[in-house]
Amino acid sequence: MPVPVTVKCRIGIDDQDSEADLERFVSAVAGAGCRTFMVHARKAWLHGLSPKENREVPPLDYGRVYRLKAAHPELEIIINGGIASLDEAEAHLAQVDGVALGRAAYQNPYLLAEVDRRLLGDSSPPRSRHTVMEALLPYADRHIKAGGRLNNIARHILGLYHGRPRARAFRRHLSEHAPRGGADIRVLEEALQLVDGPRLASLLAAE
């Protein structure tokens, strides 16, 4: 096959949720040339559950994905669904080829800062949140000057300071000010000052 094809699927759909159903599906698609499958370890209810409920209500069955990989060592099997930390990701990597982080990475994007060190052996320290924000400023400025809106970017970094002091103030400032017409990178600078300003001031005072 000249173009790589990947498939993302659930472990089952409605009443077609046996291991035999999953095996039949994967074997058929693999027979057509697909070598990579990203498998969400929940079944999907197409009738009766909303998309949001389908992400939370059906129980997770990681073991079924592990058994799929064991049955198909020649395929790349990537597991997805409810994985909330790098510790969990490492545990899954003992059984499958890859891990996909969805909501966890979106709600706490700085979670990814440790991936290279923890999972890929990179010895360099990760960029700080402050450095990430500073790098984002010129990018956001170009986006706005090209006709985009600040909120197109700001809404994706609400969780950057997840679990850190003053994270709520950071989120609130972006949520309130970034959607407004005419909002520019000053909103990002103000949000950054809310979380890092007090810390930087205390460091300067200690010198």
Tell me what each language-model feature is.
Residues 7-11, 40-43:
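Short, structured patches in soluble enzyme cores that scaffold and shape functional sites
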Residues 9, 45-49, 137, 154:
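General secondary-structure edge motif
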Residues 2-4, 13-15, 19-36, 60-79, ...:
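Alpha/beta catalytic cores of nucleotide-metabolism and tRNA/nucleoside-modifying enzymes
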Residues 41-55:
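Glycine-rich, proline-tolerant flexible connector loops at the mouths of alpha/beta enzymes
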